[in-house]
Amino acid sequence: SCPDGIATLILREVPFRGEGYILVRGVFGTLEGLLAECAGFCRAAGAERLFAAGEADFSGYPAAIRIRERSAPRESLLPAPEAVRLVPVTEETAADWAREYNARFRAVPAAESCSPAEERALAAGGEALWIWDGAERIGLGRVRGGELLAVAALQPGAGERCVRALAAQCTGPEVRLTCAEENRRAMRLYDRLGFSRGAEERVWFSI
């Protein structure tokens, strides 16, 4: 907090890709003053690119990342391809999963990296999965209830098979996820699979 307001600084992506995020909770003075104070702290921590969102009027800043809610009836994504199977991450494969995940999501707007602490918890959580098609490892994913937290193809053209396989792991009548509109390849895949375009969950503005 500072005289101009309150914000949460998200610095976990600074070591991974040099990005800092400022989530504004309230403005008491000016938004410019609050962002300047926060930006100085973020840059001192090593952030090279800064984004802000939250409870404020950001009309003077360019929208950089639009996070969109998407959903589809689970039954419409089934059955999963017959030869495709899901294999839970183990303690022996957790480091490999985290490495592949971080490599695939490094260029995805506003995606969270898998930290060393999260890597150590992957096997125990049961959410992280490898996706195999026969003898070939084609992707990875993370599922929690009816939500796809992550999906990434490791082979060209495997995206649809990965989504369908993970949908089979979901519970409930609907498969939900969020996707940055700027991640155009993923957005096109979800369009093709019949995912609806819901509300904007959050818009990050470049500062």
Name the predicted role of every residue range:
Residues S1-P3, A107-W130, G134:
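Active-site rim helix/loop that mediates acceptor-substrate recognition in acyltransferases
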Residues G26-A36, A44, A150-R164, E181-R188:
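Conserved glycine-rich acetyl-CoA-binding loop
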Residues L50-A52, L148, V175-C179:
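Conserved hydrophobic beta-strand within the GNAT/NAT acetyltransferase core sheet
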